[in-house]
């Protein structure tokens, strides 16, 4: 029997679709793209709207920053959602998560009035990635592989080397323990998984920090799936695939003007990296690393249990080429230069006039007490200060309840055009914040006096 509903479906005009889409976003701010599309089909069963057209329609929604979008400036709409694993109330009592309408996704807002210089929270990375500028210090045991604290000399007496390889060194036993899930997981330790050596050498030789992030995400999930309580692997799956903003790296780079010239080389490079990752973290039964990898999984299991093979669904979710591109895009969107991926920090949206400052402060820093606020922001780091990759989140000025907390993703000293181009290439959107709107009519996008 023919589907009369499908036969009767019509393609709505933009004049009808866009207002409906705006109402849909407003009424369901917590839903992702695919769930919104499903809701649209429920609300308007008479319409035929493909996922491709639906995504294009979302690109005409307001840009991040609160201004109005220029229809000629299409944005990439990231898939995002809420991360139920983060206890925001205990980490940052004066902050709450909010889902915004108009394609903006999630963000953070103030629950109470915040004073200038007030510390909102501190946070360590849950996935640690190193700046290429740190490679020589790390390989010479002059820096902690977990927190990036500098040593006064190589391998100081109180430090802890990795017991299995010579590529990682730590401040103390605590940093070493943290590293097993965030910076130096067993599945990427060359002493335990020899095939990881060529992968990590490739990453450092090429300065592929985003690939390092993908490798450590996969290694952490695989380790938690094999050795820890099942709940941890499920929690991480929700964080990655439902909680963090992501856009396929291929979709991002297809927006580049030179894509038609570089696409073949980029695809070949991505396929090569994907194969390397798979051989290290999920080798096939015919690969030479398969048996050593199985022995490693058994040796690290608390009960020395035989590994349970990944299901077809798990392989597709974590190790397919399409998932690799999604993870690569996710790391690119969420990675913080000073240390890697931070769970709560990743919730903050961009503004060219941010009200939040993110700092790596000396370990001697003491937050101001409530009765001493407001205070000036801490001075710049001085030579000799002992810092780490722990982030300290500070209010730049007074912030009212309900006001969104924003940071700048780019150098605020750049001109309007430079900032917007950098944001488009790095994060997929054209900024329409108040500052960009004010500077729009000025020559060269320079900031007003």
UniProtKB/Swiss-Prot annotation:
GO terms for cellular component: chromosome; cytoplasm; nucleus. It is found in: Nucleus; Chromosome; Cytoplasm. One of its GO terms (biological process) is methylation. PROSITE patterns: SET. Keywords: Chromosome, Cytoplasm, Methyltransferase, Nucleus, S-adenosyl-L-methionine, Transferase. It holds the Pfam family SET. It catalyses: L-lysyl-[histone] + S-adenosyl-L-methionine = N(6)-methyl-L-lysyl-[histone] + S-adenosyl-L-homocysteine + H(+). Histone methyltransferase that monomethylates 'Lys-5', 'Lys-8' and 'Lys-12' of histone H4 (H4K5me1, H4K8me1 and H4K12me1, respectively), thereby controlling gene expression and remodeling chromatin structures. This is Histone-lysine N-methyltransferase SET5. The lineage of its organism: Eukaryota, Fungi, Dikarya, Basidiomycota, Agaricomycotina. The gene is SET5.
């Amino acid at each position: 029997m023919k589907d009369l509903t499908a036969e009767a479906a019509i393609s709505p005009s933009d004049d009808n679709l866009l207002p409906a889409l705006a109402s849909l976003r407003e009424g369901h701010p917590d839903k992702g793209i695919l769930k919104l599309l499903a809701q649209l089909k429920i609300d308007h069963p008479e319409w035929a709207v493909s996922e491709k057209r639906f995504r294009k329609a979302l690109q005409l929604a307001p840009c991040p920053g609160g201004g109005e979008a220029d229809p000629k400036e299409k944005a990439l709409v990231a898939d995002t959602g809420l991360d139920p694993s983060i206890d925001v109330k205990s980490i940052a009592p004066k902050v709450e998560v909010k889902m915004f309408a108009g394609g903006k996704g999630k963000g953070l807002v103030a629950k109470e009035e915040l004073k200038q210089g007030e510390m909102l929270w501190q946070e360590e990375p849950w996935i640690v990635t190193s700046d290429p500028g740190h490679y020589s210090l790390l390989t010479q045991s002059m820096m902690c592989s977990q927190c990036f604290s500098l040593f006064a000399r190589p391998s100081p007496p109180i430090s802890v080397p990795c017991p299995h390889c010579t590529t990682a060194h730590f401040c103390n036993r605590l940093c070493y323990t943290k590293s097993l899930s965030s910076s130096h997981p067993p599945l990427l330790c060359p002493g335990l998984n020899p095939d990881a050596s060529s992968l990590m050498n490739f990453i450092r030789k090429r300065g592929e920090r985003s690939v390092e992030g993908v490798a450590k995400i996969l290694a952490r999930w695989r380790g938690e799936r094999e050795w820890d309580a099942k709940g941890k692997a499920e929690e991480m799956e929700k964080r990655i695939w439902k909680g963090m903003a992501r856009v396929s790296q291929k979709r991002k780079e297809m927006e580049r003007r030179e894509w038609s010239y570089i696409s073949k080389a980029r695809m070949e490079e991505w396929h090569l990296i994907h194969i390397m990752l798979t051989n290290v973290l999920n080798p096939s039964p015919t690969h030479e690393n398969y048996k050593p990898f199985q022995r490693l999984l058994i040796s690290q299991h608390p009960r020395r249990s035989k590994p349970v093979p990944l299901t077809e669904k798990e392989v597709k979710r974590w190790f397919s080429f399409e998932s690799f591109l999604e993870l690569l895009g996710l790391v690119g969107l969420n990675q913080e230069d000073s240390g890697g991926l931070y769970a709560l920090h990743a919730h903050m949206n961009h503004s060219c006039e941010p009200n939040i400052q993110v700092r790596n402060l000396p370990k001697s820093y003491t937050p101001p007490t409530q009765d001493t606020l407001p205070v000036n922001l801490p001075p710049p780091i001085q030579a000799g200060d002992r810092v780490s990759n722990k982030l300290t989140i500070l209010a730049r000025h007074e912030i009212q309840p309900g006001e969104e907390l924003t940071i700048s993703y780019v150098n605020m000293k750049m001109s309007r055009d430079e900032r917007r181009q950098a944001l488009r290439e790095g994060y997929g959107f054209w900024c329409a914040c108040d500052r960009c709107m004010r500077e729009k009519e000025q020559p060269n996008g320079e900031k007003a006096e």
